[in-house]
């Protein structure tokens, strides 16, 4: 059996979809559904059982349950970069992740967990995952969420007792189906699509940094279908333990993303950006701490044998918009 924590969240439920696509149904989903619409992410999925995250430790005490686990895919976390309760973040993102690490080490099974590109902070030291643990330890996250993720990464490298294989995944800007419950934390594709459908245009921030035109701030946008394909590759192959960037390796601008989204939504490749993009002032409190560039170095991912071409921004956005956002049933 495979445990997927955060299994009703965006990446977790998309990974359950991927497992189902590969014929795997012996899955334990671990999550909290609460009052939001996360339950819709798993409505079409086939899996063995679901358990509340607060009850997993007790469930694993039973030897019959624990001995039946082949791997743990830990996508469960508080992923809100705006969360202010550091104790909650450390308990949820560090303590729980550590508990699952120790379980996988004891059982000698694979452990794949969600780190984050937020650990890189402003990117002063670059976005390179293929460096020593000592170099990774120098990273300076900008928020408590990023710190909670970095703290576990640093802890992991110090452990003598390790899972059979462990992979910490630094996700960059993931977009795609299953993110509808995330509200403000949903991707720019989701928000751009809804802005365009409602207003006929989108708003983008002006630039306050030399070398970047208005709306041309850059991010590494990666489609969730590519993300879960990489995760599946790591699950079924023996790959080197460690930290891996999960991105496309090619930064694109918010202008590119917005135009790709609106062109896909309108089925019109000739939209003029001057007519559908409104540039607005960036709030003053953001101007000094706004990231203008992120781009994953993915050489390390390629070196372990993952050679598939990922969706281009235009390909991924078109699939997401036309086959999901525009449909009555927008779920995988």
Curated annotation (Swiss-Prot):
Question: Taxonomic lineage per UniProt?
Answer: Bacteria, Fusobacteriati, Fusobacteriota, Fusobacteriia, Fusobacteriales
Cofactor note, please?
Answer: Binds 1 NADP(+) per subunit.
Entry remark concerning the domains of this protein:
Contains a large N-terminal NADP-binding domain, and a smaller C-terminal substrate-binding domain.
Residues in the active site? 145 (proton acceptor), 182 (proton acceptor)
Supply the EC number(s): 5.1.3.20
The entry's keywords: Carbohydrate metabolism, Isomerase, NADP
Pfam families recorded: Epimerase (PF01370)
Q: In which pathway does it act?
A: Nucleotide-sugar biosynthesis; ADP-L-glycero-beta-D-manno-heptose biosynthesis; ADP-L-glycero-beta-D-manno-heptose from D-glycero-beta-D-manno-heptose 7-phosphate: step 4/4
Q: Which GO terms describe its molecular function?
A: ADP-glyceromanno-heptose 6-epimerase activity; NADP binding
On assembly, the entry states: Homopentamer.
Read off the PANTHER family from this record: ADP-L-GLYCERO-D-MANNO-HEPTOSE-6-EPIMERASE, NUCLEOSIDE-DIPHOSPHATE-SUGAR EPIMERASE
| Positions contributing to NADP(+) binding | 10-11, 31-32, 38, 53, 75-79, 92, 149, 174, 182
For this protein, what reaction is catalysed?
ADP-D-glycero-beta-D-manno-heptose = ADP-L-glycero-beta-D-manno-heptose
Family matches, as HAMAP family: Heptose_epimerase (MF_01601)
Purpose: Catalyzes the interconversion between ADP-D-glycero-beta-D-manno-heptose and ADP-L-glycero-beta-D-manno-heptose via an epimerization at carbon 6 of the heptose.
Q: Which domain of life is it from?
A: Bacteria
**What span is annotated as the signal peptide, if there is one?**
none
This protein's name = ADP-L-glycero-D-manno-heptose-6-epimerase
The GO annotation for biological process reads: ADP-L-glycero-beta-D-manno-heptose biosynthetic process; carbohydrate metabolic process
Which residues hold substrate? 173, 184, 191, 205-208, 219, 290
**Cofactor(s) required, per the database record:** NADP(+)
The entry's family comment says: Belongs to the NAD(P)-dependent epimerase/dehydratase family. HldD subfamily.
Q: What organism is the protein native to? A: Fusobacterium nucleatum subsp. nucleatum (strain ATCC 25586 / DSM 15643 / BCRC 10681 / CIP 101130 / JCM 8532 / KCTC 2640 / LMG 13131 / VPI 4355)
């Amino acid at each position: 059996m495979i445990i997927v924590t955060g299994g009703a969240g965006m990446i977790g439920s998309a990974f359950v979809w991927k497992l189902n696509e590969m014929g795997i149904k012996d899955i334990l989903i671990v999550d909290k559904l609460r009052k939001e619409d996360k339950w819709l992410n798993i409505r079409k999925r086939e899996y063995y059982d679901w358990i509340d995250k607060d009850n997993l430790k007790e469930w694993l005490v039973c030897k019959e349950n624990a001995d039946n686990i082949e791997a743990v895919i830990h996508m469960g976390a508080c992923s809100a970069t705006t969360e202010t309760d550091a104790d909650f973040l450390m308990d949820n993102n560090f303590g729980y992740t550590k508990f699952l690490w120790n379980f996988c080490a004891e059982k000698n099974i694979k452990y794949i967990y969600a780190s984050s590109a937020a650990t890189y902070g402003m990117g002063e030291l670059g976005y390179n995952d293929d460096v020593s643990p000592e170099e990774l330890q120098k990273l300076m996250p900008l928020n408590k969420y990023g710190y909670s993720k970095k703290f576990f990464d640093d802890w992991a490298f110090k452990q003598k007792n390790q899972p059979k294989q462990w992979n910490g995944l630094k996700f960059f800007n993931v977009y795609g189906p299953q993110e509808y419950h995330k509200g403000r934390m949903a991707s720019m594709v989701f928000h751009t699509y809804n802005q365009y459908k409602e207003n006929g245009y989108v708003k983008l921030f002006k630039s306050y940094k030399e070398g970047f035109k208005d709306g041309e701030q850059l991010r590494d946008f990666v489609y969730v279908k590519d993300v879960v394909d990489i995760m599946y590759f790591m699950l079924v192959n023996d790959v080197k333990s460690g930290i891996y960037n999960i991105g496309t390796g090619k930064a694109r601008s918010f202008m590119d993303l917005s135009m790709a989204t609106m062109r896909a939504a309108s089925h019109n490749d000739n939209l003029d950006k001057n007519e559908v993009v409104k540039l607005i002032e960036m709030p003053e409190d953001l101007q000094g701490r706004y990231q203008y560039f992120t781009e994953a170095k993915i050489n390390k991912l390629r070196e372990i044998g993952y050679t598939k071409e990922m969706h281009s921004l235009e390909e991924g956005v078109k699939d997401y918009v036309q086959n999901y956002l525009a449909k009555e049933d927008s779920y995988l």
